Amino acid sequence: MSNRREFFRGAGATLAAAWAANSIASEADAAAIEPMKAGVFGLDYSFWSIWADLLSPKGRRLGTSTLRLTPTHVWDKDSKKAHDFAARWGCEVVDRYDGMLGKVDVVLNGELNNVPWQHLLLRPYLEAGVPCFLQRPWSDNLVHLDEMLDLSAKHSTPVMATVPFEHYSDADTGAARIKNIGEIQAVFGTAQISDEPHFHLPYMLMKILGYDVESVSMSTDDVHKVGYLNVNHFYPRAADRRPFVSSMSAARPDAYTFTVMGEHGTVSGAMPAQADNFARFFGTLLDIQRSFEKRTLYQPLDVIRKKFQCVQAAYYSRFERAGAPVKIAAVPADWPIAAWTPNWYDGSEFHK
C-alpha cells in the first residue's frame, strides 16, 4: 500500500510539474483559451441530458454555453440514441468507443451502466493522455480501478472521479468550519435519493471529515429502489481526536442535510430539494474544466482510490455481511459491485 501511495503521489507531482512547464494561459488571457472539445460517453442512465443543457451553445442558458467545455463528439452502444443526441446538441457521432481519439480534448463518462466496463472504455484515452471523467462509483472492483489509476500515473493523464455533492460550497468550506468546534462527537446526515448510486453524501462528508475511514456498514432494503438506506463510516481514534461515526441515511425532503457535533458547537449544511440543475451540477462542470484545462488532478489518486474502497466496502457489508461493519482493508480487491444492468456489454465492443 505504501508503495502504491508513493507512486500516486509522484504522479500528482508529475502532473503539477507538467502544468507549470506548459502553462496554457495566465489569468489575464484566460478568455483566449479555445473551448475544450468534450467526448460524450453514455446516454441511458446518464448525466449527459443535464450536462449538455449547461454546456452546449444550444442549451437553455441564454442560448449559449456556460463554460469553455462543449460536447462535440458522442458514442453510445445504441446508435439511435447517439444520433438523436448529436442532432439535438450539434455533435458528431463516432462508430466505436475509441473513435474520439484525436478529435476531442477530454472525455466524460456520464453513464452509470458503463461503470463495470469503464476501465476498457477509457483505456485508449488514458494511454493517449486525454483527460477522463469517471462515472461513479468509478469501478466494479478495486483491481479495475487500479488499472485506470496506474494508467493515469504512467501517462500523466488527469482523471477526475467525483459526485456533484463534492463540488458544493458546504464541501469546500466544511473542513475549515469544523476546526472551530472542538473534538468531534458525532456526525449525522441525510440525502434525498431513489437508489444507492445517487447517495452522494458519503463523499461530501469525507471531503469535510477526512478520508481515514477504517470501517463501513450499509443497510438497505434494495440498492436499486431504496425504501430505507443507512451508511456508516467509522473513524478510528487518532492523536487529536476520539473515534466517531458518520451516520448517513436516505430521507426527504431536502437534497441533503448534515450536522457535525463537536465539544464546543456544531456545523451544519443543507440544500433544499427545489435547487435547480444549475445549482446542483454547474460546480462539477466548472471543476472539470478548471482541472482538465490545466491538466491537473482535482483530487490525489489515493483519494479516488479510498473513496472507491469505501463504497466497495459498503456493498460488501450489505451483500456479504448482512449490514455489519466491515474493515476496508478486509474487502478482497477483486470483489465486484454488481453491474447496474448486467450484460450491458457483451465484450464484442472492445475488439478491433
Features from the language model and the residues they span:
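A contiguous active-site-proximal alpha/beta segment in oxidoreductase catalytic domains
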Residues: W138-L201
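Beta-loop-alpha module in the N-terminal Rossmann-like domain of NAD(P)-dependent dehydrogenases
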Residues: D78, W89-L149
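Conserved acidic residues
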Residues: T72, D105, Q185
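N-terminal secretory signal peptides and thylakoid transit peptides that target proteins
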Residues: M1-L15
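Rossmann-like dinucleotide-binding domain that binds NAD(P)(H)
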Residues: W75, Q185-P253, D302-Q309
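N-terminal Rossmann-like dinucleotide-binding module
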Residues: L15-A20, I24-R88, F165, K179
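C-terminal substrate-binding/catalytic lobe of Rossmann-fold NAD(P)-dependent oxidoreductases
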Residues: K225-I288
